């Protein structure tokens, strides 16, 4: 059965009961030339633990874009970072709607079978997964709808296609159900149209870089305006899906796990152990470990009254009492477990360039959360190449943020493994926050690595703060400092409290995790995940403005620390950027890359060439090596005589091996001297053959031709 739905500027076509009919729910969705298959499957038996065992996989098939997978294995293998991040977005959007007590292992799989470059696959995939889940026998009150908001020429655009998004200064992805928001991802996109590189002469020795780049931060009011547009579109989409598919939804026969109550244990603990639990909460405010509660549980289990109580029932009841006490203290007293007020940021300390041989580093500590963020600068060859499904060629990622979360940061003895979904998500959020502050024309590739050394909440925002200062410490001309703060929400019986700079305890027992990053002028990135089933605009507005206060407080401290930064120029890579005639780039490369390889090996530098513009970038650790390589390249491009049809260079056909000349030294370079032979034609006398001479310009020398190769002449001294 097929349904065609016109919603939010898109025509969405759904085939149900056509494919994957043994799954609990399945839908084949078409939009433009894109086709995705979304399926939901679940096990019949519940897990014993009290949690939602949900797995979401998003898979882009290479054939969807008419490609064969690259590499030695010609099939799809492990998911790319982009696939993992999309799966994470789908998971975060759908997870809040699963009913309490649902503990069946469940898998949602979204496969991209055909990819239209103009279609937003992230939005399409979420909506397909939402409909598949709604059609299944899993009890869902209504379908989730996802939308994207862009901003072009100052106007908000609903669901921009991929081409429009290239010109947008905003990327806002929102998921919700009816009039409630469940998940938000937002990033500001810097203006790229105004950035220019000026060449002062037709082929200047040095390129002058200038920028009028705008970070395009959004004010809190602009974000709320965009969210209001998104909320209306979500209501429209959610209602449309419900109207179309409610009659096809399977009847739910699923048994939900009832929460096991232990009233006698609860009463005993509340009457006899409240004081100890409050003391334990104060200890837990300093760590994410729950060892203090375990001590209380052991004490209770050793009592005569507890001889028939299980350890699990005591621990679960203790956790409930702890949660209740934390929330009541916040809502009724306006006081948090560590003694802070609701809008208070934990103490901050900052040290920069503590690693003497790293390009730039910052140790950022906020309360019991600590991030060591290290910046490294590199050449174009160091950029990460990413193969996107809808792009014909791999794209070059010149700004990277890697986030590492070792077990010792929370006192656990766990093995250090490859980064998981959480690490990729946190690194991506920090990258989105910092990217607008980095000049698009900055010639170096940048890699930031965040090592979380301690964690008690808000480690991704510590990465943003430390990353912004690490860029400064590496001498990167960032446009503005960027800071981040994590906000929380406690909601109970029509009362609510918004918390600034939440710690792990408040994240675990709270109802919202809302991360906001930006400069003093506005927000560059934000991320919201909700646990209570949705949030209204008024509460969101309060959280945004309270986050602004916290962000500015942090930025004031960061600005003072930035004034003390001493850039370690000795360890920073050196770079020379100049231009040659684009037709000469082939001479620099040489046959099969032989010439450029020789230059790289000879001078110990890396070289990046732009064939179209004639730009040459030379990077290395020593200025002398870079200058020598530059002189060598300029000599190659200026001494290629008659090697190309239509060349205006002087003819060297009359020169022969062994010919002798009384030449004049015209230029001295670290690798040798250029000696004019006749008619303006030079020969290179290598430095290894003239070490015993103290050569000066305009000095007369008797030389003979020792080699003529690729239009270049080499000479030796006559004996």
UniProtKB/Swiss-Prot annotation:
Keywords: Cytoplasm, Magnesium, Metal-binding, Nucleotidyltransferase, RNA-binding, Transferase. Its EC number is 2.7.7.8. The keyword rRNA-binding does not apply. Belongs to the polyribonucleotide nucleotidyltransferase family. Residues 573-633 form the KH domain. This is Polyribonucleotide nucleotidyltransferase. SMART domains: KH (SM00322), S1 (SM00316). Pfam families: KH_1, PNPase, RNase_PH, RNase_PH_C, S1. GO terms for biological process: mRNA catabolic process; RNA processing. Involved in mRNA degradation. Catalyzes the phosphorolysis of single-stranded polyribonucleotides processively in the 3'- to 5'-direction. GO terms for cellular component: cytosol. CDD domains: KH-I_PNPase, RNase_PH_PNPase_2. It catalyses: RNA(n+1) + phosphate = RNA(n) + a ribonucleoside 5'-diphosphate. Mg(2+) binds at residues 507, 513. Residues 658-719 form the S1 motif domain. GO terms for molecular function: 3'-5'-RNA exonuclease activity; magnesium ion binding; polyribonucleotide nucleotidyltransferase activity; RNA binding. HAMAP family: PNPase. It is found in: Cytoplasm. Its cofactor is Mg(2+).
């Amino acid at each position: 059965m097929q349904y065609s739905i016109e919603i939010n500027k898109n025509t969405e076509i759904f085939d149900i009961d056509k494919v994957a009919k043994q799954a609990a729910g399945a839908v084949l969705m078409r939009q433009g030339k894109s086709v995705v298959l979304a399926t939901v499957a679940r096990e019949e038996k519940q897990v014993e633990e009290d949690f939602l065992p949900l797995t979401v996989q998003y898979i882009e098939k290479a054939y969807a874009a008419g490609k064969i997978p690259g590499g030695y294995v010609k099939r799809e293998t492990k998911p790319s970072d982009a696939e993992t991040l999309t799966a994470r977005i789908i998971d975060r959007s759908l997870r809040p709607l699963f009913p309490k007590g649902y503990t069946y292992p469940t898998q949602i799989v979204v496969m991209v079978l055909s990819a239209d470059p103009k279609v937003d696959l992230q939005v399409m995939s979420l909506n397909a997964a939402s409909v598949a889940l709604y059609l299944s026998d899993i009890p869902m009150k209504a379908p989730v709808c996802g939308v994207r908001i862009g901003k072009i020429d100052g106007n908000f655009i609903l669901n921009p296609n991929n081409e429009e998004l290239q010109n947008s200064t905003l990327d806002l992805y929102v998921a919700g159900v009816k009039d409630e928001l469940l998940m938000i991802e937002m990033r500001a996109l810097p203006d790229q149209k105004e950035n220019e590189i000026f060449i002062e002469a037709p082929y200047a020795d040095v390129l002058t870089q200038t920028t009028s780049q705008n970070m395009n931060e959004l004010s809190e009011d602009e974000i709320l305006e965009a969210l209001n547009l998104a909320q209306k579109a979500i209501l429209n989409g959610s209602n449309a899906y419900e109207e179309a598919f409610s009659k096809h939804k399977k009847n739910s026969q699923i048994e939900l796990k009832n929460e096991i109550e232990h009233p006698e244990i609860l009463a005993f603990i509340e009457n006899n152990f409240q004081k100890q639990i409050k003391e334990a909460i104060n200890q837990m405010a300093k760590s994410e470990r729950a060892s203090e509660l375990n001590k209380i549980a052991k004490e209770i289990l050793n009592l005569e009254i507890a001889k028939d109580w299980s350890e699990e029932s005591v621990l679960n009841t203790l956790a409930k009492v702890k949660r209740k006490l934390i929330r009541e203290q916040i809502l009724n007293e306006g006081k948090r477990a560590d003694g802070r007020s609701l809008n208070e940021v934990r103490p901050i300390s900052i040290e920069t360039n503590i690693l003497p041989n790293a390009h730039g580093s910052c140790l950022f500590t906020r309360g019991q959360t600590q991030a060591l963020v290290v910046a490294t600068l590199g050449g174009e060859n160091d950029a990460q190449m990413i193969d996107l499904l809808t792009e014909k060629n791999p794209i070059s990622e010149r700004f990277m943020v890697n986030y590492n979360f070792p077990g010792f940061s929370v006192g656990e003895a766990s093995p250090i493994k490859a980064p998981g979904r959480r690490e990729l998500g946190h690194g991506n959020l920090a990258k989105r926050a910092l990217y607008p502050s980095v000049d698009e024309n900055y010639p170096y590739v940048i890699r930031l690595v965040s090592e979380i050394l301690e964690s008690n909440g808000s480690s991704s925002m510590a990465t943003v703060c430390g990353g912004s200062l690490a860029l400064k410490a590496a001498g990167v001309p960032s446009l503005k400092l960027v800071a981040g703060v994590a906000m929380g929400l406690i909601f109970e019986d029509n009362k609510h409290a918004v918390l600034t700079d939440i710690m792990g305890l408040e994240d675990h027992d709270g109802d919202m995790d809302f991360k906001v990053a930006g400069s003093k002028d506005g927000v560059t990135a934000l991320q919201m995940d909700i646990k209570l089933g949705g949030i209204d605009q008024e509460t969101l507005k309060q959280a945004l403005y309270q986050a602004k206060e916290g962000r500015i407080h942090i930025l004031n401290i960061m600005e003072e620390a930035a004034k003390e930064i001493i850039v370690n120029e000795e360890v920073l890579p050196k770079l020379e950027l100049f231009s040659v005639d684009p037709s000469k780039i082939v001479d620099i490369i040489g046959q099969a890359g032989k010439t450029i390889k020789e230059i790289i090996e000879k001078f110990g530098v890396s070289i990046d060439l732009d064939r179209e513009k004639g730009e040459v970038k030379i990077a290395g650790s020593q200025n002398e090596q870079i200058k020598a390589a530059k002189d060598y390249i300029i000599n190659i491009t200026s001494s290629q005589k008659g090697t190309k049809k239509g060349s205006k260079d002087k003819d060297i056909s009359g020169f022969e091996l062994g010919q002798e000349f009384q030449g004049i030294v015209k230029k001295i370079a670290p690798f040798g001297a250029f000696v004019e032979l006749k008619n303006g034609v030079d020969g290179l006398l290598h430095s290894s053959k003239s070490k015993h001479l103290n050569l000066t310009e305009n000095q007369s020398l008797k030389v003979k031709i020792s080699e003529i190769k690729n239009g270049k002449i080499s000479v030796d001294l006559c004996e």
